[in-house]
Each structure stands twice: as structure tokens, then as C-alpha cells.
Amino acid sequence: MLQNYAIVLGMAVAVAIWYFFKIEEEAPPGPNPPKPDPPKPDPPKMHMPKKKPHWMDPHLTGSQTVQYSRNRSMGDPIRGDLPIIPRDDGWFSTAANPAHTLHAGALSMIAPASTGGGLTVNKLISAYADKGNAMSGRHNSPSYYGSS
């Protein structure tokens, strides 16, 4: 029987504690309500100097100053380049100079008589060799630029 009184007394204490906390939560604030914490100041900003962009350049840029119209990797090192004669007049004139851009292939260097294309490439290169002072290979006359 004593156990029953202890259970009832424990329940009454639990209800009283619950009621006490419930009343405290619903109570209106007093004359000096608590103020919220002030915001924390921002940390000091460090002004870092801007980094210069890093540009990736090919390693052989300095050694290929003559090669303006194409890369060496685009040619055929075994058979050589095709001997196409550039046009120096009209709309379709090219900036290519065969003396600077064409390369004879390895086969034409080994046996130039057996490969007709190698002889033609060598003739074309030698024909344009005198235009080496003008990098484009064009005749840079005043009429070319539209003035007389």
C-alpha cells in the first residue's frame, strides 16, 4: 500500500514541475527583456595582390620563328609536302612562302631521282628562295595594296 502512495506522490511532483516550467515559458517578459547577442564582427580582410595568368607556350616557339603558316607536326616527314604552287594575285593569294614552309620528305632526300614529287618540291623551294626577304612570299608592290 505504501507503494501506491509513492507512485501517486511521484506523479504529483512530476505534474507540479511540468506546470512550473510551462508557466515560466508563457510569462510575459519583464521590464528588461534579454537582448540578443550582438553579431560577431567580420574578420579583417587581407588584400592579396592579383596573380598574373600563367600562359602555356609551346617549348619550341622561339626556334620556329620562320614557320608562320603551319606547324612542323602537320607535314609528312617521310613523303614530304605536296608541291602546290601558290597564287600571288587576286582574292585567293596566300601568305605562304614555299621556301619557308615546304619540306622535302625523307624519300626524296634518299633517292630524289625516283620520286618525281620530291624534285618538284625542291624546284618550287628553289624558285621561291629569292623571296625570303618578304616573309609572305608575295610581291609587295603598291598596286597590291590598292594604291598606285
Swiss-Prot record:
GO terms for cellular component: host cell membrane; membrane. It is found in: Host membrane. Signal peptide: none annotated. Keywords: Host membrane, Membrane, Transmembrane, Transmembrane helix. It is a single-pass membrane protein. It comes from the Viruses. It comes from Frog virus 3 (isolate Goorha) (FV-3). Residues 27-61 are annotated as: Disordered. The chain crosses the membrane at residues 1-21. This is Uncharacterized protein 020R. Its main location: host cell.
